[in-house]
Amino acid sequence: MISNYDITDSKSSSKVLRPPGGGSSDIFGSDMPQTPRNVKNRMVSNIFSVEKDNSVKNTVRQGAHRFYFIGDNPRRGQKPVDSHSRLFGEPMRPITPGKNHMKSSIPFGQNTETAAAAQKLLTNGSSTANTTNGHQYNGKSGSVSSASSSVSSSTENLKMNSGSRSVYIRNMSNNEKSKQTKTDTAGCPLTPVASAAAPPPADVLGIDLPCLDLEVGDVPKDNEIYTETGKHDVNIQTRRDSGSNVEQPHSLEKMRSTANLKEPLALCPDYVKEVHGPCNARNPITGLGLNGDGVGGLKPVKQKIREGNPVTGEGYRAGGTDYIKAAGSTNSGSVGNGDNGGNSVVNKNRVPPGGYSSGLW
């Protein structure tokens, strides 16, 4: 505790100051709270330990969770609170018979009469115990009983009395046959009776009605008169009647068809015939073209005679691009003999082969 002494009015006043940050601050070295920490060791086995009573936890619930209804389980760690049992006592639940899982699965029929006959046959005159609604309470008596157990015991009784299930099946089939015969004779006759067809509704079309077999009557007199076609003299008869036949020039096989109106009969008066001139087009890259013949050909190549000596320049002109006649002939560019090129005078005005750096002259 820190005291602050004030000298005003010669009186000492003691004031307790709170540490910065509130009373939870530990600046002034207050003692640690003595609340024990509950550290749970999760590696400890609790197989043989006694369960702790953790029921005093979160007993105050908010909203609709405060109320428990029948069959609701409380949350984990709380006491089971049943509002119905707390207010009205233990509820009266109906007692249901126990389920016998060892009962027989033999079907005994669907209707009650057949089931009663099967039950009477299986019991073989033995009386059932006086139970509520034909069943005994589970756990109320010493013997285990239910509807299925009584059927099982009756089956055992049938075996003990040297009974046979074939007798039961035969009796069941006889009962079914007699019942079916009675039903047929009473309600439905053995021979079917033709029922009158219901009239069709007014909005049904004629095409929707079922087809009826109509009997063909007598042939009219007009249909009996006919003319035989193709009946003529044997001498002039051919394999087929055609337009060349004299007696029957117009046959059914060679009838004149209708004119095709889409095809014009003659040229239109404003029709101008296009004149196609010769195509002189040629591919400038490959040299292929039509040349007007429509077949195609090669580009004519100008033949060049290169008979001059590229070293001495014999046979070439001064330009170096034109060709001359034969090697050894005189021209303005070079002079030489017809013998060889060794005695010829080289015209050094032209560019030597390989350029001036070749060192030829």
Swiss-Prot record:
Keyword presence, Glycoprotein: no
Compositionally biased tracts (Polar residues): 1-15, 155-165
Protein name: Microtubule-associated protein Jupiter
Start and end residues of each stretch annotated as Disordered: 1-38, 70-99, 125-165, 328-361
Compartment list: Nucleus; Cytoplasm; Cytoplasm, Cytoskeleton; Cytoplasm, Cytoskeleton, Spindle
Chain positions with Phosphothreonine modification: T35, T96
GO BP terms: positive regulation of microtubule polymerization
Segments of skewed composition (Low complexity): 125-134, 141-154
PANTHER family reported for this sequence: GEO05313P1, MICROTUBULE-ASSOCIATED PROTEIN JUPITER
Residues spanning the signal sequence: none
Function according to Swiss-Prot or TrEMBL: Binds to all microtubule populations.
SS bond partners: none
PTM-bearing positions, type Phosphoserine: S24, S105, S143, S154
Keywords: Cytoplasm, Cytoskeleton, Microtubule, Nucleus, Phosphoprotein
A molecular-function term among this protein's GO annotations: microtubule binding
Stored InterPro entries: JUPITER
Family label: Belongs to the MAP Jupiter family.
Comp. bias (Basic and acidic residues): 73-87
GO cellular component terms listed in the entry, alphabetical order: cytosol; microtubule; microtubule associated complex; nucleus; spindle
Top-rank taxon, per record: Eukaryota
Species for this entry: Drosophila persimilis
